[in-house]
Amino acid sequence: MKKIFPIIAFAFLLLSFFCPIIHFLILFPEANPNCVRVGIFYYVWYNGTWENYIVDKPILGYYNSCEPNIINQHFKWFTELKLDFVLISWWGIDNKTDKVTKEVFRIVDENGNFSIKLAILVEPFNETDNGYNFTQIYSYIYENFVEPYPYLYYKLNGKPLVCFFNDEYLTDHYNGEIPKDDRFTVKIVGTRKYVNWVHPCYNSFFWENEIPRERVYTIAPRYDDTRIPNRTGYVIDPDYSQGYYQKEWKKALNYAENSSLDIILINSWNEFAERTQIEPCRDATSIFSDSYHIFNLTKNYISELKNGVKEPSNGYDDPLIFIVIALLILTVIFKIIYDLAKR
C-alpha cells in the first residue's frame, strides 16, 4: 500500500498543474494566440422613440436599449453567432448609454456567459472646445466596468481594451496621439488616416480597398445614409444585390487563412440610421424577404472562420488539447493506482 502514496501524490501534482491552465484558457479565450477573434459594434442609445428616417424595423420592434429582455435576446443572438467580444458605444458619464452599459454588464454577468467579452468604445460626447478629461474617463471605465467584471471585460495584449472614436474634439486635436493609461490597451477607431482600426462608413479613406490595419479587418454589410439630414448621401449596396458583404467576408477569410489578421470587426449589430445593422429586421429595400438573411450569412461566415481556418499551432495553445492530454495522463495514472490497489 505504501507504493501507492507516491503515485497519488504525483497525480495530485499533475492536477494542480493542469487545472489552473485549463481554467484560465476557458475563462480567458483571448489568451489563445491562434484564434481569430470576431467583435461587433453595439449601439445602446435607443429609447423606444426612434427617428423617423430609420426605415428598417427590428423584429423586436422599436425597442428601448435598457430593457432586460432586449439585452438578453441580443446576447442570445451574439452567442448563436459565436462572437468573441462586443464594443459598446458609450457617450460619457451619466449619459443614457452609460446607464445602459452598466445594465448590459450586470445582465451578462448574472447570466454567467463569459464566452462573450465586453469592451467600451468612447464616443465624441463633448462637442465643444473644452476638451476631454482622459484621466477621468479611464478611471471611470476601470472602476465601473473593469474592476467589477474582471472575467467579462475583453483584454487585448493582456490589458483591458478601450477604444476611442475619432472626432474633431476627441482625437483630432492630438492627431491621434491621445493621452494613454498604462492599465489599458488603447485603440482609436474611425475614418481618419491616423486611426488604429477602421470603422467602415461613408468617408473611410480606404474602406473599399482596405487591408488589415494592425492585423484587424473591419467589414460592414452595406452603408446608406441618404435619409439622415445633413449627410453625404453615400450608398453602398443598399438592397444587398451587389453581394458586397459576401465579398468582404471572403477577403477576411482569405486573410485569416494566410494568418494575416487577429481580429475581424463587424460594423454593426444595430446602427439602423446608417443601415449597417445585421440584427434581424424587416428591411425596407433588401431583395431578400427573410428578416434573418444577413444575420444567417454572418453566422455561416463566422462558423467557416472558426471551423474551417487551419492556423499554425504548436500543439499546446488550444484548451481542448490541454484537457485531452490531462485526461489521458490521469487515466493512465489512476489505472496504475487501481492495479496496485488490487495486489
Predicted feature locations:
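Glycan-processing catalytic domains of CAZymes
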Residues: 27-312, 316-317, 333-339
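Secretory targeting signatures
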Residues: 1-33, 40, 312-343
